[in-house]
């Protein structure tokens, strides 16, 4: 499976085309809209989320609530486009009109794609860069992830995400929660945190950053349960599932780090305390005493829960802008200011769920049959029986 997205932040719409989704998957707009709404929530979100209503239109690949096996096209309209029709129009405009309506940007923002992208593509107007590099594009990545979550659900895999840290405020580790319990708790938290004792402190940190014109980042975690043993591969570097998951996390806007299981903590512990001892019983088959590997060894699933974390840096658009240089005059200026969030970590957690869900669904479809859901389900059932008796 693969997908490609298109569209600009203030353009008419965002589009994603999904290829390789098996036939026979139950899919309706409500499944996708639920995830889009989750992305819009979270303490620290900016005014843009008050403008957009983010609902999906399914325009191909689905008939009467069932996928056909052909490419699926999903569209999300940008409600804010009505205020940008001249600025973001596709048709040519005169030089006079250009000066009046283009809202040209020549002062790149540190931390964004602005300067590097302008140099790469030769854009003298940085708006041509920021419109596409904006995290608004993650709207349709979440839509794609919603489809992946439907695949996982029908294949017996559950997934949830939560926030571990915001602006230096850390949540306590809470273990032994089911995926459903994590989902319920986080959906009722304005910062998607499992630890209610630090929830207000996280919100205060966000509010303080906003009032000072600053921004803060954080850490999110995604957990998936129900993956069969042996999904992925040790044979080739580009088929290792942990590599794909780390790459997916790093592809999210403003994410600067990824870890699986205990992650970087493994460097501080001896091997005897890091590696997960193997157990077997007649009821469960092969299991592990611990899950420090985060459900992945040698590029393949172990059958234990997948645990992936991502680090999000503070959003680079600041209301007290940093020093920059005008690319036209080369004079020192403060960077341009665009409408932005003070903290998008809770929303980014939803995006992280989506990209992890896509990689897991892709791996299952690739390994157990590509064409139809019924066949994939049968193959996974047979594989699980085989692995248990191995």
Curated annotation (Swiss-Prot):
Coiled coil: none
Gene Ontology biological process terms, A to Z: amino acid biosynthetic process; aromatic amino acid family biosynthetic process; chorismate biosynthetic process
InterPro entries: Chorismate_synth, Chorismate_synth_AroC_sf, Chorismate_synthase_CS
Amino acids binding FMN: 132-134, 253-254, 298, 313-317, 339
Cofactor note: Reduced FMN (FMNH(2)).
Class in the EC hierarchy, top level: lyase
Description of how the protein assembles with itself and partners: Homotetramer.
PANTHER family linked to this entry: CHORISMATE SYNTHASE
Protein name: Chorismate synthase 2
Native source organism of the sequence: Bacillus thuringiensis subsp. konkukian (strain 97-27)
Biological classification of the source: Bacteria, Bacillati, Bacillota, Bacilli, Bacillales
Encoding gene per record: aroC2
